[in-house]
Amino acid sequence: MFLHLMKALLKGGGVVNGYQVWLESFYNSIKGKAMRLYIIGNGFDIRHGLPTRYKHFKSYVAKNDKELYDAIEEYIPAGDEWNELESALGEIDYELILQNSEMFLVTYNTEDWSDAYHHDYQYEVDKITRMLSARLKEQFADWVKGINIADAYNSEQYIPPIPRESLYFSFNYTNTLQQIYAVPDAQIMHIHGNCSYDEDLILGHSFRVEKSLNPYIGPDQDIRIAEAYDSIDKYFGNTFKPSEDIIKEENVFFSSLKNVDEVIVLGHSLAEVDGEYFSEINKSIQKVLDG
């Protein structure tokens, strides 16, 4: 993310102090000019001819991991846009997962009972939920890293002017701004990660689960069913996008927005799943406007 990049750019005084020094120098260099913040979404890359739609990712998964593709099709009711996928991760049909796995829930008094039956049901539920969380994210990261930014050079859809003397808040994982418009890394906040750096890329929903989805917790519940619900709960935790924590981690960047005069949105739908970021941006800028 942002301070991750600054570690490579700044020496001495600590990363945060170094970034604050850099900001002061940056603001002095553009004194008298309008200070803009560009919010960049996937539509920006799409306009440059890059295959970054959700349907392109699904095609990649269909080719490289058919089992995962089938699970996505069955349990995640997403449309064609990224914000729909992220929202759908929080609307996974977990009841269908439990229902489809019931063939492994063998009754205890069956004649051919095996000790393996103690674990088969919850194992199947856990396998599906892990596939739709960890494995999906692994395939996603591999796909993003394989996107060829050079394809954007051939695009007739450049968006002039993209001034370098601005700050950029990007939801994209690609380096289109850097490679096509020569915007320095230090002026770009890749809020969900950058595919060029060895870090986790963030993909998730905004549905915070406050308590277990298990409706019948108690000593009389079949332990296999209880453990299956544990896997469901873990899924929602593992696919949750911790926007609040990310904002705290990147507080230096958000504090820097106090000098912004204008916000320009390019290629983002302002979807609810990213609402916390927009609220924080608005709050950071509003502090100045309110005096």
State what each model feature region is.
Residues 5, 12-13, 22, 26-48, ...:
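SIR2/sirtuin-family catalytic core signature
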Residues 36-69:
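N-terminal ordered "arm"
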Residues 56, 61-193, 198, 254-256, ...:
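Active-site periphery "cap/insert" segments of enzyme catalytic domains
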